[in-house]
């Protein structure tokens, strides 16, 4: 798996999806995630709970301009009905890298 460097912009998406919206949410993601690379984006991690009602993405972009271009892409708009119908509540948070903790210094670590 390729990892982002500190020069990249990193975002975390936390999606909370009602059980009856999971299929629509996943259809939207299947249509949209392949577009990331066209805009300097990279899906670093994609995590999901067992029933698909919570999904977390760690995504990075090479520039804010490309992130904005990705968000404005008409292909995303064309499938927006899927995410809307899913009733997913999405939170996108900009994040920054933190220096690694020295081994054994985290609370509770030994």
Mark where each language-model region is.
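Short, conserved catalytic or adaptor-binding loops enriched in Gly and charged residues
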Residues: 35, 82-86
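Short S/T/G/P-rich N-terminal loop/turn motif that feeds into the first structured element of a domain
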Residues: 1-72, 77, 90-110
């Amino acid at each position: 798996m390729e990892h982002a460097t500190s020069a990249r912009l990193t975002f975390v998406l936390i999606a909370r999806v009602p059980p009856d919206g999971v299929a629509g949410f996943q259809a939207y993601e299947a249509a949209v995630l392949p577009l990331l690379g066209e805009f300097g984006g990279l899906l670093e991690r994609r995590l999901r709970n067992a029933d698909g009602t919570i999904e977390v993405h760690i995504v990075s972009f090479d520039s804010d301009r490309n992130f904005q271009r990705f968000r404005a892409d008409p292909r995303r708009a064309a499938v927006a009905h899927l995410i809307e119908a899913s009733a997913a509540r999405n939170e996108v948070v900009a994040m920054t890298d933190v220096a690694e903790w020295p081994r054994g210094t985290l609370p509770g670590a030994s």
